[in-house]
């Protein structure tokens, strides 16, 4: 369980840095799309990070998978979210699809590298 807590915390910490660096852009983008200020549903966010932790641990880390495989899993996971938004929201920017999809791969790869530096 300690391993999963490390993964969970690492995902949140790295994502906080990413979201913080994009916050001004994201606030405007979400405001333009939903016509109200960005407000995070923390239960939804918690469940999202639990799901991301499960995916990364079950499919990659528990099997000592390659960092490239972690990158591809993150890329695919974030691509599903981004392309769904791109398909369903009129003003979802292609820039966000590209940047956030790449970030998913980077997030999973960095988290895996940190995990392996401690546990392998």
Please identify what each model-predicted range represents.
Residues 1-120:
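Juxtamembrane/disordered regions of integral membrane proteins
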